Amino acid sequence: MGSFSIWHWLVVGILVLLLFGKGRFSDMMGDVAKGIKSFKKGMSEDDAPTPAPKQIDAQRAPDLSATPTPTAETENR
């Protein structure tokens, strides 16, 4: 039960031949090859350099930190 016998492999082979047949399998491999070629062609077209991003002159943001102001309590101490 742990390994497959020759009969198991024969049944699997017959099922594969029935499902895919002689012409279907070669057609599928041709379609896969066309897809790979198309993918490679698309990847080679994307190698065009992209323009550098624009440099924006940044201005320093105003300092919004809280500064303590004197109050009546702190003046009396």
Curated annotation (Swiss-Prot):
Residues 66-77 have a biased composition (Polar residues). The lineage of its organism: Bacteria, Pseudomonadati, Pseudomonadota, Alphaproteobacteria, Sphingomonadales. Keywords: Cell inner membrane, Cell membrane, Membrane, Protein transport, Translocation, Transmembrane, Transmembrane helix, Transport. GO terms for biological process: protein transport by the Tat complex. NCBIfam families: PRK00720.1, tatAE. This is Sec-independent protein translocase protein TatA. The keyword Plastid does not apply. Residues 41-77 are annotated as: Disordered. PANTHER family: SEC-INDEPENDENT PROTEIN TRANSLOCASE PROTEIN TATA (PTHR42982:SF1).
